[in-house]
Amino acid sequence: MTIERTFSIVKPDAVKRNLIGAIYRRIEKTGMQVVAAKMLSLTKEQAQGFYAEHEGKEFFDALVEYMTSGPVMVQVLEGESVITRYRELMGKTNPDEAACGSLRSDYAISMRYNSVHGSDSPESAAREIAYFFVEDEICPRPAE
């Protein structure tokens, strides 16, 4: 059993609609654990840095504007195959294509306002976690 970590964001549209608890319940119901979390209002510079890989793409400015439009919840999730499992729980980026019962199918407003983010690889997870958390802010929880 390989325990891994992934990074997750509850985006401004979901925070504004008071969906944090509902999203956390769904995460925990699947056996994944929240091992670090904080609410932030991203600055333009933080959002640009986090999404630097998309700089120059036509949607970049709108993405930065959206991610700075209100508070977000950033969290580290831990569990077996958590990167793959959380991406399955999120569903496809476009909520119209997301599997029924996924977070995006249930909560996203549109492709732009798609409620959640999750790392797509172990490398991305490590980079994204380190962008917002230092190691001693992460509190592993014993398995039941």
Swiss-Prot record:
Annotated binding of ATP, by residue: K11, F59, R87, T93, R104, N114
Keywords for the protein's UniProt record, in alphabetical order: ATP-binding, Cytoplasm, Kinase, Magnesium, Metal-binding, Nucleotide metabolism, Nucleotide-binding, Phosphoprotein, Transferase
Cellular location(s): Cytoplasm
Keyword Magnesium in annotation: yes
EC number(s) per entry: 2.7.4.6
SMART domains: NDK
Gene3D superfamilies: Nucleoside diphosphate kinase-like domain (3.30.70.141)
Example GO BP: CTP biosynthetic process
Single GO term (MF): nucleoside diphosphate kinase activity
GO cellular component labels: cytoplasm
Listed cofactors: Mg(2+)
Reaction catalysed by this enzyme: a 2'-deoxyribonucleoside 5'-diphosphate + ATP = a 2'-deoxyribonucleoside 5'-triphosphate + ADP; a ribonucleoside 5'-diphosphate + ATP = a ribonucleoside 5'-triphosphate + ADP
List of catalytic residues: H117 (pros-phosphohistidine intermediate)
Top EC category: transferase
Entry keyword Nucleotidyltransferase: no
InterPro entries xrefs: NDK-like_dom (IPR034907), NDK-like_dom_sf (IPR036850), Nucleoside_diP_kinase (IPR001564), Nucleoside_diP_kinase_AS (IPR023005)
Principal location listed in the UniProt entry: cytoplasm
Pfam families reported for this sequence: NDK (PF00334)
PANTHER family: NUCLEOSIDE DIPHOSPHATE KINASE, NUCLEOSIDE DIPHOSPHATE KINASE DDB_G0292928-RELATED
Quaternary organization: Homotetramer.
Family: Belongs to the NDK family.
Function text: Major role in the synthesis of nucleoside triphosphates other than ATP. The ATP gamma phosphate is transferred to the NDP beta phosphate via a ping-pong mechanism, using a phosphorylated active-site intermediate.
Name of this chain's protein: Nucleoside diphosphate kinase
Source organism of this protein record: Aliivibrio salmonicida (strain LFI1238) (Vibrio salmonicida (strain LFI1238))
Gene it is expressed from: ndk
